[in-house]
Amino acid sequence: MASFKGNKLYVHGSGLKTGILITNLGTPDEPTKSSLKTYLKQFLSDERVIETPKAIWWPILNGIVLNTRPAKSAKNYKSVWTEEGSPLLFHTKNQLSKIKEFINKKYQNIVFAIGMRYGNPSISKGLNNL
């Protein structure tokens, strides 16, 4: 996670801003075996998702799941992928646009970003963009 202490981007007296981070669970970058492997490894390594003890789960994940599931998952993702990319990311960007439009009618100095728990853009990248 990024550190925001001593942030050189902050300028004293520049006025207050409010940041809004729109988050979601996440999506792979593309519907390919390699992208799904990266995404599934991140997602399925989270102890809040898989509560099996790490000593038991790690060999299953790395020995079986990540060698079989990405190709199957890529096929499923390809069936829902659009020209705009991931449906989840596309709809999240659309929601952000509508939220931004609504809020900017009433308030100023609001900055917006998207962050995903798994995949890109990550929550820490979203926070950095604020």
Where are these regions (language model features)?
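Active-site-proximal alpha-helix that buttresses catalytic centers in soluble enzyme cores
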Residues: 2-130
